[in-house]
């Protein structure tokens, strides 16, 4: 067999399941975290991906622990009336979307409940008012950034294996290579994507053009072999804005000027609307480009997003919320919770490229923004400059090292603190400094309700602050991810 790696994986999976039962006629009763559904069997919780409440299924158990089990649908006996038809042919394989089979109203209901469970059960937080969850107007084609991986070894479907293995000659490299998303749990394989309904249609067009161009010239453009660390084509990043601008970043493993120039020239000619055509030579073991030099082949080194008359520059390394339209709704909630009157000194923690800082700057006296990434702070300063905003100051460094009592003494005590930390939440030292600063209001924006609940415990432990409002904002339809904004007021 030419493609033994796939059969090895199948045999390994079969061995793992050998002693685990197949449960028949199981009714799914609800939804759980991380995009899974659940039911209860003999006092244990059973988690099942891609199931819907009301489904009656035969379920193959894949993991069995003392308090819970995990399984996969072997057969849907009776589909739930809640089930909808997924829009994507890659659904259940790709791993990017977990809930395309559920109506959006049910997705929102589940996400809202996840937030409430986190605050009430994990944090034991008393919330004055839960405002209705803000759903996304766009549930398809809403992402402004997508990243794809070139791999010499793509995921092959059983029918593809049958065809290739029936041949007397080994498959050509282009028949095994792919450009798409990493499969969950399989670091060296990608799913060759035809259409991704998360990004703009032009993203599909550009990705398919690059894939077809390189696949037609396998000797010149070998796809990357992650295990052997060899090949040329590594990753492709695409970004778009609501203003119609497009950024393309092609990452090569090594320099090959002739091949690189030919590909980028072909891209430029086929898509003259590209605003920023960039490339990177990344010879490291991993795919991250944060520490790599960015080269501009054509156009600008950035694209611009617009929000409420403000323009924000976005570079290849910049963080910007991946749902532009819904980011505006998120920031409006944060600004509303800040209750600015024009006289306040605001601290914007984890400011990124200064989007929130600049968004609220015209409604307050001054803003101090702090962010770990120096390049992001440079973008934040530029964003203030291009928008004629002169009441912002930005500082780069580790939050717990920058935000100190001395820093606050130098820059003035904040009336309002807006904090939007990464998924890990805030360091305990940062929480302690916020409490010492004693702002009148704290607005906590979070992409992880569990760590937000943990931090809210610390912020409310002394009794100085109460949580007055909470509002979930859905930035990522068809996924389990959710943003939540909380207002704390000093008693």
Residue ranges of model-derived segments:
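Short, aliphatic-rich beta-strand segments
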Residues: 238, 244-253, 311-315
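Terminal RNA-binding accessory module
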Residues: 1-86, 90, 393-394
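Short, acidic/hydrophobic/Gly-rich beta-strand patch recurrent on exposed beta strands
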Residues: 37-42, 179-183, 251, 380
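Short edge beta-strands and adjacent turn/loop segments
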Residues: 229-243
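Extended interfacial segments that mediate partner engagement and assembly in macromolecular machines
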Residues: 75-86, 95-222
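Rossmann-like S-adenosyl-L-methionine
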Residues: 2-25, 33, 255-491
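Short, solvent-exposed loop/turn elements at beta->coil junctions and helix N-caps
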Residues: 131-138, 224-227, 234-235, 471-475
